[in-house]
UniProtKB/Swiss-Prot annotation:
Provides the cells with the ability to utilize trehalose at high osmolarity by splitting it into glucose molecules that can subsequently be taken up by the phosphotransferase-mediated uptake system. The active site is at residues 312, 496. This is Periplasmic trehalase. InterPro entries: 6-hairpin_glycosidase_sf, 6hp_glycosidase-like_sf, Glyco_hydro_37, Glyco_hydro_37_CS, Trehalase_periplasmic. One of its GO terms (molecular function) is alpha,alpha-trehalase activity. GO terms for biological process: cellular hyperosmotic response; trehalose catabolic process. The gene is treA. It comes from Escherichia coli (strain SE11). Its EC number is 3.2.1.28. Substrate binds at residues 152, 159-160, 196, 205-207, 277-279, 310, 511. Pfam families: Trehalase. It is an enzyme of class 3 (hydrolase). Residues 538-565 are annotated as: Disordered.
Amino acid sequence: MKSPAPSRPQKMALIPACIFLCFAALSVQAEETPVTPQPPDILLGPLFNDVQNAKLFPDQKTFADAVPNSDPLMILADYRMQQNQSGFDLRHFVNVNFTLPKEGEKYVPPEGQSLREHIDGLWPVLTRSTENTEKWDSLLPLPEPYVVPGGRFREVYYWDSYFTMLGLAESGHWDKVADMVANFAHEIDTYGHIPNGNRSYYLSRSQPPFFALMVELLAQHEGDAALKQYLPQMQKEYAYWMDGVENLQAGQQEKRVVKLQDGTLLNRYWDDRDTPRPESWVEDIATAKSNPNRPATEIYRDLRSAAASGWDFSSRWMDNPHQLNTLRTTSIVPVDLNSLMFKMEKILARASKAAGDNAMANQYETLANARQKGIEKYMWNDQQGWYADYDLKSHKVRNQLTAAALFPLYVNAAAKDRANKMATATKTHLLQPGGLNTTSVKSGQQWDAPNGWAPLQWVATEGLQNYGQKEVAMDISWHFLTNVQHTYDREKKLVEKYDVSTTGTGGGGGEYPLQDGFGWTNGVTLKMLDLICPKEQPCDNVPATRPTVKSATTQPSTKEAQPTP
């Protein structure tokens, strides 16, 4: 779906000639994607709709994950014959024709474990494989074992996995890191991109693009060999995110690519489908019905695209923070996504150079530099003093401060003076007793106040350290770790999200109950423990008093971006 081009001529920035060569070469690879498995709402048609609307299961994900016991077409034919017969029992029909997902076994940790020991003991508990995937299973097979987040999440998730892998590396499980990188490379080769998760109903979208950072992490252990090995898959993923760019005119958008009126190229989140999400079917239908002034398909697309962002859901995407039906994800250009795209371009340049292709390395550097200028020009709110998303409807940078504003610092794309202002804004507006707030808005959505999420704590900590802001970075790590420790001391588990307005409380809001496990919290906790404690005296629990910043080992970045006025 393209947006119309402006009616009057616009000045266009000079786009590097290499960009069209890069995308032309890679688009061929993207077009080789085979026929993909159909999601259950398509396979089962009216049966899927009727089961979900009947609310047979408390969690809509249950039936989306159910495995048909025979050909779905035959099951659907039987359903059509039986559904209007006297005494027909839909629940019985489902029980006969489907194998429902099993409840995960409750993990009871040994008594007396430290926080670190608990996490190290969880890695095998959270490890899964898809060796025995059934023919009509929505679960997509992967060649190697993988670590799932935990709780209701029985599959691997894209951006979760990077932060889980940080912890695996910290625990010395480089074999598991290598397995997960291989799995994601397999998905790119098989489907043309990394889906939201390894389910057929997730194939229409991706998630925040961390694959290049995963390869870079693996290269810490394997050297440049990892960069060279996975260069083709990184290029294919880049082609997926930039698909359609070669035909865009100024002021247009196509799928995940946005070309602004001066020719600046940026990215947005997008889902190729505009129907209710199978895993949240009833909720999405209700959201669309609650706003009759918008086409339902438009709302469905924006709900799905918010899921692609990983922030499902947040006031960040909404016009009215208390009405989910006002979200418009596809008309917002996210600062975190474009920071990750900048990082992908930088890693592609490094990998190309390692592979001996200096010309291609220079082309990726040119693309990264152009994107960096775009971030500085369009995603810095000078009046507020922080990075923010760009609004395609108002043609202005938005005013809301969110934890996503730390991503330019995380990838070393921020100008030094702006990083300093971000440190002040973070400490003033987002830092809470239990860690970093996701936003300052209390909307009831899970990616808003008072919730704090492990990946955003790490992005902020690492980003601030990159620019020498070690005190604020330590404050974030210390506050969040204290929250994690207090919750663990009371409940003997780590959870998906935390209430950062206090310490020792799991977060609330969202479409499902609080989940424990939990992959990315485990990973970030291990990284932060090793950050705040000296290498000579590693800690297995969070110290009782705040450490000094000298234990933080990351050196400040000397890089300064060149802001475009």
